[in-house]
UniProtKB/Swiss-Prot annotation:
Annotated compartments: Cytoplasmic vesicle, Secretory vesicle, Microneme; Secreted
Cellular component GO terms, alphabetical: cytoplasmic vesicle; extracellular region; microneme
Superkingdom, taxonomy of origin: Eukaryota
Protein keywords: Cytoplasmic vesicle, Secreted
Protein biosynthesis found in the keyword field: no
Organism: Toxoplasma gondii
Protein name as annotated: Microneme protein 21
Length: 347
């Protein structure tokens, strides 16, 4: 079922046409396909979105009524204990940072330390160099987010000094929703097309882009492996930075290939600071009709949102967000008639 108009559609957004390319970053996935669609333009806000505030107010009662709350997590909280992923408290297993397992020939999700209570501290999710994701049914994802509702997710941005920053004018943390089946895999087999580590690895592997690789920006069967890898990297970055040109990309790639350590990150940071006006915020979901709540979903947490015809996008007004607020945003996005009626009752 596609998302119907509901009681929380408080804001609209303008869209404009962009050329979007859906691309896999690994050779075992589908070849590059070109698509043209509307990409979100996000309008700035300075406080927690009103839609999140409204839904969060009555969300726990609503989810309890629907039988979505995880009993193990709720019991732990009733005894004044803190749920921890490391202790096995998560109601689902498909969450974390994607990595490609060469022995299995597919990508998996690694939780790492985020959402674990370690040495007296609630370890946050951090995104920037990598995206983080959770997958399952809508009920699965809501149950998971509410279980860890007091944990934080922190968006980091790559600064011109080559370091990752979480303080200052960082910008928003973004949520993106997508149906898992878009990638023709099960709930743990989606390979992310983006990570800073992967980009740097390709620069190290191939070195300077020179005349020997020809027109790398024009995909063709005759392209060398190096040219194809350069093209793939450019396309995965362009999904995050729509105004990136081939000339600027090649300039930064070649400069980064001559640097080491932090020097490489300083060069790469130039790509993510292009046209900052394309990263404005907004206070409501954009393009929810692209996602079917009746099927399994992937929820991405990111600093650098992807422009995709298969994704819905939500931006918070800050870079530190509790998972409880994420749950409210997802609940607002994935509502149906039953949820709408319950929200009206409790709000």
């Amino acid at each position: 079922m596609l998302f119907p108009p509901g009681i929380f559609s408080e804001a609209t957004a303008f869209s404009h046409k962009r050329s979007i390319r859906s691309i896999s970053s690994h050779s075992t996935f589908d070849d590059v396909t070109a698509e043209t669609d509307e990409a979100p333009v996000l309008a700035e806000v300075e406080k927690m979105p009103a839609v999140v505030k409204k839904v969060k107010h009555g969300m726990r009662k609503v989810l309890e009524s629907l039988g979505i709350l995880d009993s193990k997590c709720e019991q732990k909280k009733k005894h004044n204990k803190i749920p921890s992923a490391a202790a096995g408290d998560s109601p689902i297993k498909t969450f974390g940072y994607p990595f490609y397992d060469t022995s299995l020939g597919r990508s998996l999700l690694r939780p790492q330390v985020g959402l674990s209570f370690i040495e007296g501290f609630m370890q946050p999710i951090k995104v920037g160099a990598f995206d983080w994701m959770v997958q399952g049914t809508v009920d699965d994802v809501l149950s998971f987010l509410v279980c860890f509702d007091d944990y934080e997710a922190i968006a980091e941005k790559l600064g011109e000094d080559g370091a990752w920053h979480s303080e200052g004018n960082i910008g928003p943390l973004y949520l993106q929703l997508q149906n898992t089946s878009q990638y023709q895999g099960d709930a743990s087999s989606i390979l992310m097309a983006y990570s800073v580590e992967q980009i740097l690895g390709r620069i190290d592997a191939w070195g300077v882009i020179d005349q020997t690789i020809g027109h790398w920006w024009k995909p063709a069967a005759s392209l060398s492996e190096k040219a194809k890898s350069v093209y793939d990297t450019y396309q995965s970055l362009k999904e995050r930075v729509p105004d990136l040109t081939t000339e600027k990309f090649q300039e930064v790639w070649n400069s980064a290939s001559t640097k080491s350590g932090v020097g490489k990150l300083k060069e790469l940071a130039k790509l993510f600071t292009l046209n900052p006006e394309t990263r404005d915020l907004r206070d409501s979901w954009e393009n929810l009709d692209r996602v079917d709540r009746g099927r399994k979903i992937s929820l991405y947490v990111t600093s650098y949102p992807k422009r995709s015809r298969t994704m819905a996008t939500f931006a918070f007004g800050e870079n530190r967000v509790k998972l409880g607020d994420m749950a409210a945003a997802v609940a607002a996005a994935t509502k149906d008639t039953t949820l709408d009626n319950l929200l009206k009752k409790y709000l």
